[in-house]
Amino acid sequence: MAAASGYTDLREKLKSMTSRDNYKAGSREAAAAAAAAVAAAAAAAAAAEPYPVSGTTKRKYQEDSDPERSDYEEHQLQKEEEARKVKSGIRQIRLFSQDECSKIEARIDEVVSRAEKGLYNEHTVDRAPLRNKYFFGEGYTYGAQLQKRGPGQERLYPPGDVDEIPEWVHQLVIQKLVEHRVIPEGFVNSAVINDYQPGGCIVSHVDPIHIFERPIVSVSFFSDSALCFGCKFQFKPIRVSEPVLSLPVRRGSVTVLSGYAADEITHCIRPQDIKERRAVIILRKTRLDAPRLETKSLSSSTLPPSYASDRLSGNTRDPALKPKRSHRKADPDAAHRPRILEMDKEENRRSVLLPTHRRRGSFSSENYWRKSYESSEDCPEAASSPTRKVKMRRH
């Protein structure tokens, strides 16, 4: 058997098996030593590098995202700094009690009633959907009333064009502000009452610096609301951006604006902040050098080009501003309905005058009206006969 297996002696076989086992053991020891060397090298590399090699991609991403994060943080810091500047120009006082508010609110209702009866001057009352303004002492042109849009174009009305400040405003509001040293004696010569219905608003604006002194004082009544700074308005549909600062305004509270809050940033009332009827009395002082409309001595520079030169002579009182709306007496709910624009009135008038079969023709009703009107000018008989129909040829 020993010869068949290739070994001549059992001792040789045992000797050969022992050498193989020793080789295997030596290989295992060498592998363990090599693994230990690799681990030691990896530990040394980890100690030399702040991040492992496998984290290089993550580190690069973090480095790339740092500028974006810093820009956002910079924007937030700027916004917080601007809000701090706004707050530095705001002073709020809870001055009027519930009973005092009720008395003043009853007086405001009297103002609304007198306006509905047409007892005020033409420029005292300014109506808009969901918001009415009542000017006392001094009034001024703004918004769509201006011939030229933009800051600095506002003008005071001539003296006497708006009613005097009611005596109750002096007794119930102004006098208390003077007693608490909010404003000095004799400071106020302009009082405006803004009456808002739910959903009403006033767009972002700065009270004209060339018209009014600072501070600007307002007192709130009927309900709580908020005064927002730095908003941007968009219309159709109406949308308002996030404010730099939203200032809660409580019923009976006094808000005083000056400095940055009055001059360097816009303020507004958002529609979502008027949930109930709200009124605010704004008390201001006009500047001595504030520009004023002069209706008796108008210059051609303040009139539209269509005005003839002979209209500048005499004692005509043509206003130096384009008409904003009709000043005829309206029913109590008229101010809270959508305005009917002049173009809508014209379209309605056409629909009444045009024949029924012409209202929905294959050509524009506007062209039909224009051609019909031109034909009536050429034919006096057609102009004098309202029932005469003008047949137009289609082209």
Swiss-Prot record:
Keywords for this protein: Acetylation, Coiled coil, Differentiation, Dioxygenase, Disulfide bond, Iron, Isopeptide bond, Metal-binding, Methylation, Nucleus, Oxidoreductase, Phosphoprotein, Spermatogenesis, Ubl conjugation
Keyword Cytoplasm annotated? no
Which residues of this UniProt protein bind 2-oxoglutarate? 194, 196, 205, 267, 278
- Residues bearing N6-acetyllysine are 133, 236
Q: Which cofactor does it need?
A: Fe(2+)
The source's domain of life comes to: Eukaryota
**Residues with Phosphoserine modification:** 65, 70, 88, 326, 362, 372, 375, 385
Q: Which GO cellular component terms are attached?
A: cytosol; Golgi apparatus; nuclear speck; nucleus; paraspeckles
Q: Which GO terms describe its biological process?
A: cell differentiation; gamma-delta T cell proliferation; membraneless organelle assembly; mRNA destabilization; mRNA processing; regulation of mRNA export from nucleus; regulation of mRNA processing; regulation of mRNA stability
Recorded coiled-coil stretches: 68-117
Give the similarity note: Belongs to the alkB family.
**What is the name of this protein?**
RNA demethylase ALKBH5
Q: Source species, please?
A: Rattus norvegicus
